[in-house]
Amino acid sequence: MKILVAVKRVVDYAVKIRVKPDKTGVETQNVKMSMNPFCEIALEEALRIKEAGFAKEVIAVSIGPSQCVDTLRTGLAMGADRGIHVETNSIFLPLTIAKILKSLADVENPGLIFLGKQAIDDDCNQTGQMVAALLGWPQATFASKVVLDKDKNVATVDREVDGGLETLNVDLPAVITTDLRLNQPRYASLPNIMKAKSKPIKKMTVQDLKVDIKSDIEILEVTEPPKRKSGVMVSSVDELIDKLKNEAHVV
């Protein structure tokens, strides 16, 4: 069985986000970029499944500019067998990304597709669900535990929901999106970083995959959240009640 893992290049989580002066997006020039943390978890889970003998190959896929090769090399250093880079300088919304992944799945015929539940740059939480719908495959989102039954060709997935956990059985092939509690991603060792340089990365274009990139959604503007007034320290409960009553008028 092959496992296809989508990995996204995003602004590093430790970087303070700045909006471009023209408000067309966030500034990505001269800032640290890294693999989306949820994608790292997805890749780690795929690697563990392979190491347990349930899969023969893990393929990392990234869609974006030429710099996405660095993200793929990180994935290869973690243990992925090969990479696919769909190169584009356009910024695609989730449905277009899902169409591209669907086309790649048609070519690669994986038994599982793993994605992070969302990317930390846009927080859309849509791509995995859309990929499953386009393929007509079952899906399990927000996975916090994944157990495969090779004989029954079924994945049992614990998923986090409001107020608890839900357990699903999904027939393979399936799409699974990963939550934070699923695992702790490994660090790439120096020998594996060196080995990753010789692992293959196949370059493709949207045109190669014959994907319709037309979108019915247009991003009009990206703005920073409004600045909030700083909080006020009070010295006693009586003073707090007084301010809530006479200044905030909430009691």
From Swiss-Prot:
Its cofactor is FAD; AMP. GO terms for cellular component: mitochondrial matrix; mitochondrion; plastid. It is found in: Mitochondrion matrix. InterPro entries: ET-Flavoprotein_bsu_CS (IPR000049), ETF_a/b_N (IPR014730), ETF_b (IPR012255), ETF_beta_N (IPR033948), Rossmann-like_a/b/a_fold (IPR014729). The keyword Mitochondrion applies. Induction: Expressed constitutively. Not induced by dark treatment or sucrose starvation. The electron transfer flavoprotein serves as a specific electron acceptor for several dehydrogenases, including five acyl-CoA dehydrogenases, glutaryl-CoA and sarcosine dehydrogenase. It transfers the electrons to the main mitochondrial respiratory chain via ETF-ubiquinone oxidoreductase (ETF dehydrogenase). Involved in leucine catabolism and in phytol degradation. This is Electron transfer flavoprotein subunit beta, mitochondrial. It comes from Arabidopsis thaliana (Mouse-ear cress).
